[in-house]
């Protein structure tokens, strides 16, 4: 009898469990945040969380192509366009950090005292090796917008090199080339931790109001994609934006430094 009850219970649990497919960015993956959230979510929901980490552009395309139930991304303009086209629903801001410019420590003195615009002009005028993601990610979109504000993206210049890689891999390329790169702070802290607190690339510009980096979750629209698990995607969005989970994200640190910020402004994007 006990065996029958155990088998029935196992079958019931199996039937209720689901696999939630998420498309997300390399920055949420590289920082280790998702690895930390995964066991918490799986324990509370009984589901399995699986994700593919790509640039935001590719993540949104996965949603458009019905290959993900939920998206965790960070390019507000692209996200809103995605929503406008009817590919996503329930877009909810979660957290933010900021973008920073980092450079080989031998170049740091060149940037001293310069604001964001002056730092970009320095890179351009002195032809400092600059590594661009070049992958339509949230970081790539932000970087391109900064160059456009300065007159145009210098794609044809030899000093401007596109990696086509994720954030952490692109940082390592910038390190190898003793160059400059725009990154989100969370991934930089992860890189810094990997280098045991002694990174070759250091922060040379930060703090400009335009460099806020907002992350949101979006459910793939079930009216557009009949195959997606909207029920569990919706529950995940409520879970990740609950006070309990947001407090966990706010307390998530490396080198005793928070990687993401939670506050009221985040929730109003």
Swiss-Prot record:
The complex is composed of two ATP-binding proteins (TupC), two transmembrane proteins (TupB) and a solute-binding protein (TupA). PANTHER family: EXTRACELLULAR TUNGSTATE BINDING PROTEIN. This is Tungstate-binding protein TupA. InterPro entries: ABC-Tungstate_binding (IPR052738), PBP_domain (IPR024370), TupA (IPR053775). Part of an ABC transporter complex involved in ultra-high affinity tungstate uptake. Specifically binds tungstate. SUPFAM superfamilies: Periplasmic binding protein-like II. GO terms for molecular function: ABC-type tungstate transporter activity. Pfam families: PBP_like_2 (PF12849). It is found in: Periplasm. It comes from the Bacteria. It comes from Campylobacter jejuni subsp. jejuni serotype O:2 (strain ATCC 700819 / NCTC 11168). Disruption phenotype: Mutants contain the same concentration of molybdenum but they show a 75% reduction in tungsten concentration and a 50% reduction in formate dehydrogenase (FDH) activity. Keywords: Periplasm, Signal, Tungsten. Coiled coil: none annotated. Gene3D superfamilies: Periplasmic binding protein-like II. Residues 1-17 form the signal peptide. Binds tungstate 50'000-fold more tightly than molybdate. One of its GO terms (cellular component) is periplasmic space.
